[in-house]
Regions:
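Membrane-proximal helix-turn-helix segments that form the acceptor-binding/catalytic region
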Residues: 83-86, 101-102, 106, 119, ...
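Acceptor-binding helix/loop patch of EC 2.4 sugar-transfer enzymes
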Residues: 60-66, 112-143, 182
Length: 267
């Protein structure tokens, strides 16, 4: 009698090096591991050669229209690939494309969802309120998904609190994901070249590093920096790029904030 192989496929359109650790971990527990993505950027860890990479369209965030088009095309590709190629696989949906997990309501695969960004809540950042028909339909679909899913994973207790409106607390697991690597070595402040370059030797640094898009509530740092202008020992750093960055820079300049610095993404 043949033994049924354990198979799993991850769905993540814009897979970065953080997903490599997930894939490598699944390789220790599953016979077949695949990922539907536009491509994978490897970090200090190499991806296990056992992983099968199945390409879908690349996520394009150059404009709202391109973002919606590539999300929609990616979602359609995911549906058909799961239907015809991965019928007997467990599925892990990441929230890119955010609509890809809708496929789970049409398929019989066991599945889990990893919530990096919370939709439809994130739509409010672009002016779509919770009373809008799109928002209400999305919310209804999400509740059905949560009822059917084996588990939901998210990044923090705060995000879990938001997700409780869609499903039971027992299903929602908090996993503060990040890439683990023995190659990441702490550098003492006195010898840190970044500290020296930006004159942070005698500062307490409050830093945000990542995307600065409409769905990222980083404007609170501007408000905190405004309230701490007289504390010369504190320096705020906002590192990254995104649609909201220009507005935040203008806001900081309008308030004449000397205690916050904006920097591009760092290597």
């Amino acid at each position: 009698m043949s033994i049924m192989k354990k198979r799993i496929v991850l769905v993540n359109q814009s897979s970065g090096f953080l997903v490599v650790d997930d894939l490598n971990a699944y390789c220790t527990k599953y016979d077949c591991v695949s990922i539907l993505c536009a491509g994978i950027k490897e970090g200090v860890r190499s991806i296990n050669p056992k992983v099968q990479i199945d390409k879908i369209c690349k996520y394009n965030k150059a404009s709202t229209l391109r973002r919606l088009l590539t999300w929609s095309l990616g979602t359609i590709q995911v549906l058909f690939k799961l239907l015809f190629t991965y019928r007997n696989f467990e599925v892990v949906y990441y929230t890119n494309p955010p609509m890809a997990c809708f496929s789970a309501l049409l398929l019989r695969n066991k599945f889990r969802i990893v919530e990096y960004d919370i939709y439809p809540n994130a739509l409010e950042a672009i002016g779509i309120s919770d009373r809008h028909i799109i928002y209400r339909i999305w919310k209804s679909i999400k509740k059905k998904l949560y009822a059917k899913a084996d588990a939901i994973y998210t990044l923090s207790e705060g995000m879990k609190e938001i997700l409780l409106e869609y499903g039971e607390a027992e299903k929602i697991k908090v996993v503060p994901l990040w890439s683990a690597s023995d190659d990441f070595k702490p550098i003492c402040k006195e010898q840190n070249p970044f500290v020296k370059e930006h004159h942070l030797e005698n500062k307490f640094v409050v830093m945000y590093s990542g995307n600065i898009g409409y769905t990222h509530s980083v404007e609170c740092l501007i408000e905190v920096a405004k309230n701490m202008q007289t504390d010369n020992d504190v320096k705020f750093l906002m590192i990254g790029e995104g649609k909201k960055k220009t507005d935040l820079v203008a806001q900081a300049e309008e308030l004449n904030l000397r205690n916050i610095t904006f920097l591009p993404l760092q290597d």
